[in-house]
Amino acid sequence: LIVGSDTYPPYIYLNNDGVPAGIDVEIATEAFRRMGYAARFETIDWEQKTNLVESGAIDCIWGCFSMDGREEVYRWAGPYMVSRQVAAVDADSSIRTLGDLAGKTIAVQSTGKPEEIFLSGSDPRIPQTVEVLSIENRSVQYALLSCGYVDAIAAHETGILQYMKDNSVEFRILEEPLLVTGLGIAFAKNDTRGLDS
């Protein structure tokens, strides 16, 4: 089965040998093995994930993928894990709460849950004056924060912690999460193979 994913350490990334590795790779490999399948991982254009799974170019989307708000878009297996979507700032920043983001700039991954949360304007904790910078390549948002080009970033907490560890960078994660979400495996709505069960 072809598993489509973006790189998102520690969930899925290429190890030093260029081979997919990470939490999701281990879980997917074992789950599909138990079902009698071998998993083959392909890095995809994350913005095209729905088109790729619906067209059959990939069998599923698996890679730290939040189920919340997408229940009707895909056929889901999961959740297999719970994750916190959070905002992070420079360690010395005066920003302490989501409300402190008023008039500030935050970088998020395009098509991700944080982008949806910030752009929807539906969360009363988030000021309407936050400027949202949507980035296709997730790793760029970390660099933007490190260099001071943005005031904050938002992503899965585990991903932020992994980036800090791998790059010896000190960010401060805000205490209040944007969202606590279940992570799942997304199949096309018209997929009738029963792989989601």
Question: What are the functions of these language-model segments?
Answer:
Residues 1-6, 88, 105-109, 153, ...:
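Short, well-ordered beta-strand segments
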Residues 1-65, 72, 132-135:
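Extracytoplasmic small-molecule ligand-binding "clamshell" domains
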Residues 6-7, 81-89, 157, 161, ...:
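Periplasmic-binding protein-like
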Residues 9-15, 70, 96-97, 116, ...:
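Short, solvent-exposed loop/turn elements at domain surfaces
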Residues 13-17, 28-38, 77, 113-135, ...:
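Ligand-binding cleft/hinge of the Venus flytrap
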Residues 18-26, 43-44, 108-112, 135-139, ...:
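Soluble non-cytosolic domains of exported or imported proteins
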Residues 25-35, 92-113, 158-161, 180-197:
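Extended ligand-binding regions for polar small-molecule ligands
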Residues 48-54, 62-73, 117-121, 143-179:
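A ligand-binding cleft/hinge motif common to bilobed small-molecule-binding domains
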